[in-house]
Amino acid sequence: MPHSVSRRTTGSTRLLPADTNQARGLADYARDFLLHPQPVGARTLGLLERFHVDSVGCGVSALARGANAPTVLRREALASAPAVGSRGAMCFGARRPVAIEKGVAADAAAVREWDSNGTNFGHDAAKGRTAGEFGHNDFYPVALAAAREAGLDGDQTLRVMLLIDEIRGRLAEVFPLRAYAIDHVHHGAVASAAACAAALGGDVDAIESAIGMVVAHYVPYRAIRAGHQLSDSKGASAALSAEVAVSAARRSLAGFIGPKDIFRNPLALYRRNVPCPDGQSPFDLELGLSGDAFAIHSMHFKLGLYEHQSAGALQALVDLFARCPGLAADPDGIRRVEVAIYEPAFSIIADPAKRTPTTRQSADHSLPYILARTLLKARATATAGGAALAGGTTPGWNELMLLPDDYDAERIADPGIAALIGKMAIIHGGPEYDARYPDGIPTSVTIDHAAFGRLESGLVCYPLGHARSDQAATETLVDLKFDRLVAGAVDDPAALASRVRLAGKSVEDVAELYAFPIHGCDPG
């Protein structure tokens, strides 16, 4: 079982106190971060590159397989043209530029469609900022579009990406949007508006205006995540928020004046939901400037397609297969599976409606389905044996990696899935589990098996992929995931990975970074 790995991050930060105009402070910070850069640590930049490459693999796979939302939004983008005087944005796999906001929406939707890119849980224990809001690195297309428009090179573009991840990551540590039924992508929209406006040369007034417009006009609610079966709106939420963030940035640069001092506005979402005295917002906001003092070091990788709060249960299964080698080959002998998890995971992925998913969007957010599919995949691997086991004797993350085919209509309807789900009980682990989130993903799995008796995983907190897990093992699996996702979509997965790494790339390289062919995808 992976153990916690402690990593110290050092570097300078900037504090924006609650009793200041934090929107203007963010604007100053964004401009300074891009225009007066301090050295960023090699570990931070390397991690950022890996998260970006991983996101590209997710996006390319979704488009190559004709996933609905990104295909619809890409088609819409390809029907648009850049505004007069604009260089436009490039959609994945296209050969001509489109309207910036449309291209950003299409690319962000593709990146997010599989729900397999990087994840953060808003946690900085050292500073006592543990709001635990979710977030994902869905917004890199904003940085690419701004870079193309502004003529930035690869190293400058990486800073725009890091700026977006830093702002949304630090907001996630101090303000839990989910507690007020607001979708987590809103933090990314605020970050995107600030970073885009700054990258395009906006002054402090314009950047503050863009932030104010996003907060005042474009707040997405978690209605997109309610109901028995999830829709395209769930997967495209970040894309639509990125679209309006870019529009707000460009509109502000054109002279539109949005609300000022929005974080202390008594009727904006922050003080409206967390009342506090006039002249204050509900939180201090501290942002990294240099070294490795960035929120990205608390971001996690997904080692396949699954809602990330399932990762602890998946690691528990991998541990049980290693501990009881006969288990993988005999899921039919399972009499009961009990999974103990924490809040908010219990409410999100153990919702009773998730026991009978009929769409991929619901299945990949269904803990029972994810576990059932993994058990069936383990049996197939164990039965095949030999070369099917990558150097081991029992199936591990390599063999059990959940991919798009694991969520197709045939597998969702597999009677074996329903049979296993019928044996599962998902319970709330109680205060002991809740207290360990968001530092970890506390989960335990207990299996009652006809042949092997009672099998207990013990408490899993840091599954592979988690920021505090074994990073070397995680990196190997992330690279493997990329290769598997883009296989069949491009001629040479390794060449694609090299192409989209940004360090040292020229302005011309960055402008055409996503303009590579994708098999089966309209080049426009």
Predicted regions mapped to residue ranges:
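Well-ordered alpha-helical scaffold segments within catalytic/enzyme domains
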Residues: G59-A62, V142-A150, A193-A199, A248-R251, ...
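Carboxylate/His-rich catalytic cores and anion/metal-binding grooves
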Residues: G85-G88, L144, G151-L152
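Terminal-appendage/accessory-domain detector
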Residues: P2-G132, S233-E243, R250-G524
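Residue-level detector of well-ordered alpha-helical segments, enriched
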Residues: L47-F51, D138, Q156, V160, ...
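Conserved, well-structured ligand/cofactor-binding cores
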Residues: E49-R50, K127-Y140, E149-L158, D183, ...
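Glycine-rich, mobile lid/loop segments that gate access to catalytic sites or pores
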Residues: A147-E243, S247, D261, P266
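Short connector loops/turns at beta-strand edges and beta->alpha or beta->beta junctions
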Residues: Y140, E166, A216-P220, G288-D292, ...
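Well-ordered alpha-helical segments within folded domains of soluble proteins
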Residues: H136-L144, G188-A195, A242-S247, S310-L314, ...
